[in-house]
Amino acid sequence: MTELLARLAESGAEYYRRGWMLATAGNLSVRDPEDASRYFVTASGGHKGRLRAERDFLRFELGMQNPVPQGVKSSAETIVHDLIYARFPDVGSIHHVHSPKVTLVSRLIGGGNLWELKDFEYIKALGFWGEGDVVRVPVVVNHHHIPSLGDAVERAARLDARVPAVLVDGHGVYAWGDSIDAAQRHIEDLEFLADMTWEERFRPR
């Protein structure tokens, strides 16, 4: 498990370098491959560019049943990860980042709407390979009551289980995959697609 957490820390460092997880924002998690009911998620307040496997991740059972060690604060958004892992057994890793263009596009599209992507070659990185495929990524309202946010993200994720992401209005994106690498690929792809969406639909002329 230490090796997987070290790999997840590498994702955090890469996101920080790109400016996608600044000011301790965001959270990352990975499911335990030895026990599908267990996952590890970043603790609250940690610098995402300097994560360490032995220090910055908390173990949880589905349902958030296990206690948090004294002196360590869990991320309030752990509940979002918990609900996604419970709903989708094939999900192996979840990444929540505040990448700039995705966050901007989430505001421009607005909560309760769908971000429609078509005719972009890059939707293949999200698993859509068919000619004429259309990807509809849900955008949910940013509830400050985190359990409500978790419910909103989980409900939106069920709209089309093929779509490995949900945007939160003004609050970045949750993306997932069957592995850390897959989740990171989806994060990177969505930021590229958001940049293209900005240029094509929203950039002032």
Which residues fall in each region the model found?
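Glycine-rich flexible loops
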Residues: 1-205
